[in-house]
Regions:
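N-terminal localization/anchoring segments of enzymes in phospholipid and broader phosphate metabolism
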Residues: 62, 81-84
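Extended, loop-rich substrate-binding clefts of extracytoplasmic carbohydrate-active enzymes
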Residues: 26-65, 113-146
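A short, sequence-level motif marking secondary-structure junctions
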Residues: 10-15, 74-81, 98-102
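Intrinsically disordered, low-structural-confidence terminal and linker regions
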Residues: 1-20
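Active-site beta-strand termini and strand-to-loop segments that position acidic
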Residues: 64-67, 86
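Beta-hairpin (beta-strand-turn-beta-strand) motif
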Residues: 76-78, 87, 98-100, 123, ...
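Primarily extracytoplasmic ectodomains and periplasmic/lumenal surface modules that are beta-strand-rich
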Residues: 69-72, 78-82, 89-92
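Active-site-surrounding "flap" and adjacent substrate/cofactor-binding loops of secreted or lumenal enzymes
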Residues: 88-107
Length: 146
């Protein structure tokens, strides 16, 4: 395997479902998030966590793989790199969460630890727990890009 291959697959991950968001987000303007605050409107804010119910949830994963690495990306959770496996050693070189258990750390509430998230314009961005779009393409040389 000399090039990067791309596969879309389903992963079942035990998940604590996200509670309903605040219906009046303008009242969450004074919520302090890691020494930052702001106006979330028109976005809704999750102000609580669910610890009573855990379900097996199916996630779409974009898997990029070559002979050395296997990278799993979860577009449904902000496009976060869920796992990165060094195939030569069998070592996951980012922390891989085995349970999705949101905490109230994100700008709009829900955030999970593990993997790698895209952080812009600052840490734990507003869309870090929101679904994102993705496109995969195979280049003329057979290399996959996402």
């Amino acid at each position: 395997m000399n090039s990067v291959k791309c596969e879309i697959k389903k992963l079942i991950i035990p998940t604590y479902p996200e509670p309903s968001a605040e219906e009046l987000p303008m009242f969450a303007e004074n919520r302090v998030h890691q020494r930052t605050s702001g106006r979330p409107y028109p976005n809704k804010v999750v102000l609580k966590v669910n610890r009573e119910e855990k379900i097996d949830k199916e996630y779409t994963a974009v898997v990029l793989e070559n002979e050395y690495l296997k990278i799993e990306i979860l577009p449904e959770i902000g496009g976060r790199i869920y796992s990165a496996l060094d195939k030569t050693t069998g070592y996951d070189f980012f922390y891989k969460q085995h349970v999705i258990k949101p905490a109230l750390i994100g700008v709009l509430g829900s955030w999970i630890s593990g993997g790698v998230e895209f952080n812009w314009p600052f840490h734990h961005r507003a869309s870090g727990f929101m679904p994102c779009d993705f496109v995969t393409e195979t280049l003329p040389d057979g290399t996959a890009v996402c």
